[in-house]
Amino acid sequence: NSDEQFDDYGYMRF
């Protein structure tokens, strides 16, 4: 994903 979002664990997903 190109959007910066935090998953349920708190890691940034790009």
UniProtKB/Swiss-Prot annotation:
It comes from the Eukaryota. The modification Phenylalanine amide is found at residue 14. The keyword Protein biosynthesis does not apply. GO terms for cellular component: extracellular region. It is found in: Secreted. Its main location: secreted. Belongs to the gastrin/cholecystokinin family. This is Sulfakinin-2.
